[in-house]
């Protein structure tokens, strides 16, 4: 067999292995826009494609971003922002209009996978005034998606944070706060009945920075050399798994044992507060990318995970919120991250076949 043919076969094998590797990871990146110096929407989507980032979270139905996503084959979590939740809950006509304008008009050119109705609405935060509208808005959007003929393609959910969890230690004893059960139980029931996952924002950084005396940095960064928490037969070496499994346990306690979880935000700031350093962020992100393929002790298997965020956003507050980006606004990577392909594979593909240029290079 000719050397060139062997090289092509080897390359194809590497490409197949690469695609499996990235699929296992199920990684996405959140596309926030709270900056006055960010690239154009088309540049951003091209950056996702060039880095082989196949999933994206969008916090509102920005028409420029949705148009840029046409034909990209990137899977999208499309946000219905908190400011619209009350309006959507007030009547089906509003839900139908929203779905037509922001979903149906872009389908199937834009691969919307989930609609996140609200972000971190909670009875115990500044969004408490919206809590009574959360489930009605979920139901109305769900019905509107079904009426649009997309009920088998798009799941409707909401994104929550860890403030709803009352007990998280040990993870098997995870439970929702008693004073929010009136809010969380109907959400879990809705997701169970519609077979949709709960979207959860999980930040080991905030748990660590708020309690460094009790939580070690290695445990938060996935670098603990030994088991930190023994929970029955389950062993925990990192805080991410412990937090994730506490939510699974909480849902099981409320009849949601069949409900999956998508980690809809997860990141580490590089500046602006205690523990927020370039080195810590790089370590956390590299390990998160690797760990997303593996699953947690309670739920082994790939974890669909969205890293927060694509860019540093200079209009956010407080200061540390400005420093969660994987990239600077000039599109230069802040970290040497790898979404599943080694530099060697990139070099081989570039030398052997120009059509492999879509392979991800190291970030």
From Swiss-Prot:
UniProt EC number: 3.2.1.39
UniProt tissue specificity: High levels in leaves. Appreciable amounts in stems, roots, and sepals. Tubers, root tips, and all other flower organs contain very low levels of enzyme.
GO biological process: carbohydrate metabolic process; defense response
Residues at the catalytic site: 120 (proton donor), 265 (nucleophile)
Compartment annotation: Vacuole
Coiled-coil stretches: none
InterPro entries given in the database record: Glyco_hydro_17, Glyco_hydro_17_plant, Glycoside_hydrolase_SF
Keywords of the record: Glycoprotein, Glycosidase, Hydrolase, Plant defense, Pyrrolidone carboxylic acid, Signal, Vacuole
A Pfam family this chain is assigned to: Glyco_hydro_17
Key word Glycoprotein present: yes
Induction: In leaves, in response to infection, elicitor, ethylene, or wounding.
GO cellular component term, pick one: vacuole
Catalysed conversion reaction: Hydrolysis of (1->3)-beta-D-glucosidic linkages in (1->3)-beta-D-glucans
Residues making up the propeptide: 341-363
Glycosylation sites: 353
Protein origin, superkingdom: Eukaryota
Family assignment from sequence similarity: Belongs to the glycosyl hydrolase 17 family.
UniProt-listed PANTHER family: GLUCAN ENDO-1,3-BETA-GLUCOSIDASE BG1-RELATED-RELATED
Protein name (Swiss-Prot/TrEMBL): Glucan endo-1,3-beta-glucosidase, basic isoform 2
Organism: Solanum tuberosum (Potato)
Gene coding for it: GLUB2
């Amino acid at each position: 067999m000719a050397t060139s043919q062997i090289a092509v076969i080897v390359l194809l094998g590497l490409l197949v292995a690469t695609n499996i590797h990235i699929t296992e990871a199920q990684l996405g990146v959140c596309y926030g826009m709270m900056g006055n110096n960010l690239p154009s929407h088309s540049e951003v989507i091209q950056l996702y494609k060039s880095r082989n980032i196949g999933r994206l979270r969008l916090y509102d139905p920005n028409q420029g971003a949705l148009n840029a996503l046409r034909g990209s084959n990137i899977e999208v979590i499309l946000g219905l922002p908190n400011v619209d939740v009350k309006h959507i809950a007030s009547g089906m006509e509003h839900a139908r209009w929203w779905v037509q304008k922001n979903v149906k008009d872009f389908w199937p050119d834009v691969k919307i996978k989930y609609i996140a109705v609200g972000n971190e609405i909670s009875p115990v935060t500044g969004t408490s005034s919206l809590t009574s509208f959360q489930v009605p808005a979920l139901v109305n959007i769900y019905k509107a998606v079904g009426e649009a003929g997309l009920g088998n393609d798009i799941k409707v959910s909401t994104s929550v944070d860890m403030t709803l969890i009352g007990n998280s230690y040990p993870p098997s004893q995870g439970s929702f706060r008693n004073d929010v059960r009136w809010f969380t139980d109907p959400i879990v029931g809705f997701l169970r009945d519609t077979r949709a996952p709960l979207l959860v924002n999980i930040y080991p950084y905030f748990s660590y920075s708020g309690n460094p005396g009790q939580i070690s940095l290695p445990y938060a960064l996935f670098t603990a050399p030994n088991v930190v928490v023994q929970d029955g037969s389950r062993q925990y070496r990192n805080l991410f798994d412990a937090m994730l499994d506490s939510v699974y346990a909480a849902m099981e306690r409320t009849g949601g044992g069949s409900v999956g979880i998508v980690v809809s935000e997860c990141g580490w700031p590089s500046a602006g507060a205690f523990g927020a350093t370039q080195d810590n962020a790089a370590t956390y992100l590299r390990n998160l990318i690797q760990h997303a393929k593996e699953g947690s002790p309670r739920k082994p298997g790939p974890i669909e995970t969205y890293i927060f965020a694509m860019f540093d956003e200079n209009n956010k507050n407080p200061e540390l919120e400005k420093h969660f980006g994987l990239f600077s606004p000039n599109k230069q990577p802040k970290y040497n991250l790898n979404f599943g392909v080694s530099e060697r594979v990139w070099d081989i593909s570039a030398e052997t076949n120009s059509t492999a240029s879509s392979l991800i290079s190291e970030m």
